[in-house]
């Protein structure tokens, strides 16, 4: 019988709750429109995650993707975790490798 290897980045329920509380007050840093998830959008998200660790994104009405689809597509391409999806908005978290910022303590 094979053991399932857990994802080292997987967040606990307590960590998700803490990140949701922090993300509540954020304004969307990334807007996803008609072009969906492009390389330029991924690069912008990478930069925002490195600078802030926790970002909020919004899917505009013209997009062909739902917020859940966009969240998972962007999280996969940026190696981030989806914290929460509500309506047209979602939050992503990834620990930053930068040492010059205040890291979120989980």
Label every PLM stretch briefly.
Residues 2-106:
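Positively charged, polar, low-complexity stretches
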